[in-house]
From Swiss-Prot:
GO terms for biological process: apoptotic process involved in heart morphogenesis; atrial septum morphogenesis; atrioventricular valve morphogenesis; cell adhesion; chemotaxis; chondroblast differentiation; chorio-allantoic fusion; extracellular matrix organization. Gene3D superfamilies: Complement Module, domain 1, Thrombospondin type-1 (TSP1) repeat. It comes from Homo sapiens (Human). It is found in: Secreted. Belongs to the CCN family. Residues 25-94 form the IGFBP N-terminal domain. This is CCN family member 1. SUPFAM superfamilies: FnI-like domain, Growth factor receptor domain, TSP-1 type 1 repeat. Interaction with integrins is heparin- and cell-type-dependent and promotes cell adhesion. In skin fibroblasts it binds ITGA6/ITGB1, in endothelial cells, binds ITGAV/ITGB3 and in platelets, ITGA2B/ITGB3. Binds, in vitro, ITGAV/ITGB5. The modification Phosphoserine is found at S188. Residues 286-360 form the CTCK domain.
Length: 381
């Protein structure tokens, strides 16, 4: 009797073990939902261990498995402990990652935290990366919104765009009117410029343009809607960093809806720690443009560019002048992550630089800070 019970228990244990093994193995064919899952703020999408479906990456100290991998972009890995047959583990930071100090607190590598209600941050190997939790504050207001402004909403953290009516006189109207007469602008044109509106091209014309553009823009015609659109694009802004990876932005309406949208690109004026005087020729005070001595891969969010490039960087001067990009182009660059996931980002490639004494952003603190929605940007406190 006891031998039968022992055999039955052994059979049950064997079946349970086989079931666990079956659940841990990858399917012969991938069957994924049509829509990607929606993850919490600061949580990225990664492919499961079988390379099939996109899932929300597990964060620090969360349970993980082959089908529920950890967020490798934050330096996390699934720790199964000493057991070689364990099916579930816990997301731990890789041992080589450095902790972060932010606002007088220490955070471990891979640890996520929320310093305020508007940002979700993560410690990534000694640097803190944050994403905004209020994306509407980073976007442009809708066209036709007079005097748009961000206002606080009772009981909410994020501010919202509010459109004012023309019942209250703008104190800038008199100044705009004076400037308009002196510079030859129409008063309505100045008002539309401030409101981010498109204005008519010529009298009685149904075409529109932005006053900030001096050259004639091209015309985009939508036959389905029967509308004409003047395609206009502003120049790229300065890079948000004097050295290292930064962000550059511009505004354009080059899309089927003819809507003003903000575009971003990754930029790097020069690597941090670049020697200032070593490359100067005898008698020269400036080194305008420098080319990378060897092909390099760009890095972004822990992923590497598929191709290697030899980018140009701006140099420096010894007489107080600063060197900034003069001519640039934008390259659509493909990146590949450790799990095989690929994505594309716009990247600035410098063609030439210029050096002058006009250095309004020589102080790093004076730089405008641009954020890419749903991306992580590194900065040090």
């Amino acid at each position: 009797m006891s031998s039968r019970i022992a055999r039955a228990l052994a059979l049950v244990v064997t079946l349970l073990h086989l079931t666990r093994l079956a659940l841990s193995t990858c399917p012969a064919a991938c069957h994924c939902p049509l829509e990607a899952p929606k993850c919490a703020p600061g949580v990225g999408l990664v492919r499961d261990g079988c390379g099939c479906c996109k899932v929300c990456a597990k964060q620090l100290n969360e349970d993980c498995s082959k089908t529920q991998p950890c967020d490798h972009t934050k330096g996390l890995e699934c720790n199964f402990g000493a057991s070689s047959t364990a099916l579930k583990g816990i997301c731990r930071a890789q041992s080589e990652g450095r902790p972060c100090e932010y606002n007088s607190r220490i955070y471990q590598n891979g640890e996520s935290f929320q310093p305020n209600c508007k940002h979700q941050c993560t410690c990534i190997d000694g640097a803190v990366g944050c994403i905004p939790l209020c994306p509407q504050e980073l976007s442009l207001p809708n066209l036709g919104c007079p005097n748009p402004r961000l206002v606080k909403v009772t009981g909410q953290c994020c501010e919202e765009w509010v459109c004012d009516e023309d019942s209250i006189k703008d104190p800038m109207e008199d100044q705009d009117g004076l400037l308009g007469k002196e510079l030859g602008f129409d008063a309505s044109e100045v008002e539309l410029t401030r409101n981010n509106e498109l204005i008519a091209v010529g009298k009685g014309s149904s075409l529109k343009r932005l006053p900030v553009f001096g050259m004639e823009p091209r015309i985009l015609y939508n036959p389905l809607q029967g509308q004409k659109c003047i395609v206009q694009t502003t120049s790229w802004s300065q890079c948000s960093k004097t050295c290292g990876t930064g962000i550059s932005t511009r505004v354009t309406n080059d899309n089927p809806e003819c809507r003003l949208v903000k575009e971003t690109r990754i930029c790097e004026v020069r690597p941090c720690g670049q020697p200032v005087y070593s490359s100067l020729k005898k008698g020269k005070k400036c080194s305008k443009t420098k080319k990378s001595p060897e092909p390099v891969r760009f890095t972004y969010a822990g992923c590497l560019s598929v191709k290697k490039y030899r980018p140009k960087y701006c140099g420096s001067c010894v007489d107080g002048r600063c060197c900034t990009p003069q001519l640039t182009r934008t390259v659509k660059m493909r990146f590949r992550c450790e799990d095989g996931e690929t994505f594309s980002k716009n990247v600035m490639m410098i063609q030439s630089c210029k050096c002058n004494y006009n250095c309004p952003h020589a102080n790093e603190a004076a730089f405008p800070f641009y954020r890419l929605f749903n991306d992580i940007h590194k900065f040090r406190d």
